[in-house]
């Protein structure tokens, strides 16, 4: 999608397929809605009084209003005026874009970013507007037959009407939001593709395609022999159960930071299990199809790299993706097996369905060579995190308060929420093994915490945080599909680090 700005005092003269104006739940019209109301001789106020309640995200389309050039005026609910905030604004922008999609129009004009929010600058409002619109306009049809693909017109452009003084900051925010939306689109599509299409090799080829598109990106894709030479015994043990060959993907964004005495790069590590049947510890059949989403950590790394490369962010960033399948076979891991990780630590595999940590631990050890300023791993790691936090907050684990605080601040600003969970040393006792340095599970209690504790054993050399996105990377049910999270959180963190 494209986003741009327009400055005008004559909203009623704008020629567009759809014009969005905000209405609060208490019947108060936004400044833009008042302009359209006057031009239409009170038509907006009359509708608001009789049938439009202005609830957050609600819409009502008015066609061919007298005195207004727009083909459609879309009334968008902003909720209660006293409670209007950044999240309500994002919901309104997404609702407008969804209304445009439903009306099959290719472009629209929004006045919503111009509605002031205390403590939220126009740049941030514009950024969230673009992200929200991109989410509403997303459409998946990659695996439909030609006859069943949706051929309706796509929403391609939204223009934000702003004051002249706010135009530059709005344009900057829209540019940032558009890049994040494009990254989320890639992340969602990779997640939604089936496991027989989105294989480890497919992820590697996607990374190479990004490097061809963006000059700031360099990509190296390692295969089995190279991974064996590195001594990644834990990662290899998971991959051994599948006929699909593994890939270890290394992405580098050379951002040319302004600081000469710069710290090392930020490293993003993504879990890339392109299908997880659980291995010998086989998962139940019900909803196993959703285990194609077990690579959403890897997908979010690729989506984030697409966004930061589009923005040419002045920050050095490295991405690491350990990609393979976790399937049962005669060569698969067995409960009780002991494997040696790249770090030299031995691991007793008590449950082969706790495989994400087995591939991540070697990637986290590999990250040491970059002398990173910070390492953040992203993984659909535990069902226990879903039990704890549901589908709203991603789980955040870190012993580094500064890194955790920066990520939490980014989560709030990006409207991509995370919640910090404990990482106390006392939980490490659950991972004791009689036969190896560490067990790969710690029993039912505090499953998300002990999974993070396991990973922490491989992160002593740098500041580290773990994002468990098992509850937030995709939705189930009738709206089943990948969400694109936590690309907004990660990009906001990187934007903050770049200054």
Swiss-Prot record:
A GO molecular-function descriptor: manganese ion binding
Sites where the protein binds Mn(2+) 2: 271, 276, 294, 355
The enzyme's E.C. designation: 3.4.11.1, 3.4.11.10
Catalyses which reaction(s): Release of an N-terminal amino acid, Xaa-|-Yaa-, in which Xaa is preferably Leu, but may be other amino acids including Pro although not Arg or Lys, and Yaa may be Pro. Amino acid amides and methyl esters are also readily hydrolyzed, but rates on arylamides are exceedingly low; Release of an N-terminal amino acid, preferentially leucine, but not glutamic or aspartic acids
Keywords associated with the record: Aminopeptidase, Cytoplasm, Hydrolase, Manganese, Metal-binding, Protease
Compartment(s) of residence: Cytoplasm
Enzyme class: hydrolase
Transmembrane segments: none
Named cofactor requirement(s): Mn(2+)
One GO cellular component, as annotated: cytoplasm
Cofactor info, note text: Binds 2 manganese ions per subunit.
Positions with a binding annotation for Mn(2+) 1: 276, 353, 355
A GO BP annotation: proteolysis
InterPro entries assigned to the protein according to its UniProt record, in alphabetical order: Leucine_aapep/pepB, Macro_dom-like, Peptidase_M17_C, Peptidase_M17_leu_NH2_pept, Peptidase_M17_N
Listed HAMAP family: Cytosol_peptidase_M17
Family indicated by similarity: Belongs to the peptidase M17 family.
Protein task: Presumably involved in the processing and regular turnover of intracellular proteins. Catalyzes the removal of unsubstituted N-terminal amino acids from various peptides.
The name this protein goes by in its record: Probable cytosol aminopeptidase
Source species of the chain: Bordetella parapertussis (strain 12822 / ATCC BAA-587 / NCTC 13253)
